[in-house]
Amino acid sequence: METDLVSRLEEAANRFVIPLRMNEGFDEQALLQLQEEIDRCGTARREGTHVPKRAALTLAEPFPAIEACAWLYEGKVRQRIQEAGAMVSEAVTAALD
């Protein structure tokens, strides 16, 4: 897995999670980009022999962060954030499977 790919994954994760953490709202486009980068990492992982430590750590971070951020919000927004967390978790599982 190339360094550039891991950097893009980190950037996508930060672009989605940081605004949630700062209580700035839910960004659907940032979520879609995060899922795309996770999928790219999955493709690279299947073509390679290992997952670099930096990539593994980056893949492990979004779900608990998203789940924790959900409690900053109420109602339908909280529910959507929790759904997004589950979607990200499923994407990571598929990428590493």
PLM regions: where:
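Short, solvent-exposed, charged loop/turn and helix-capping segments
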Residues: 39-53
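Charged, amphipathic alpha-helical oligomerization/scaffolding segments
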Residues: 4, 8, 33, 37-40, ...
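Amphipathic alpha-helical binding modules
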Residues: 58-97
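Residue-level signal for well-ordered alpha-helical segments
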Residues: 8-11, 15-18, 50, 54, ...
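Secondary-structure edge/capping motif, primarily at the C-terminal ends of alpha-helices
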Residues: 16-23, 41, 45, 69-73, ...
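Alpha-helical rod/repeat scaffolding segments in eukaryotic adaptors/tethers
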Residues: 20-27, 48, 52, 74, ...
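Short terminal alpha-helical segments
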Residues: 1-35
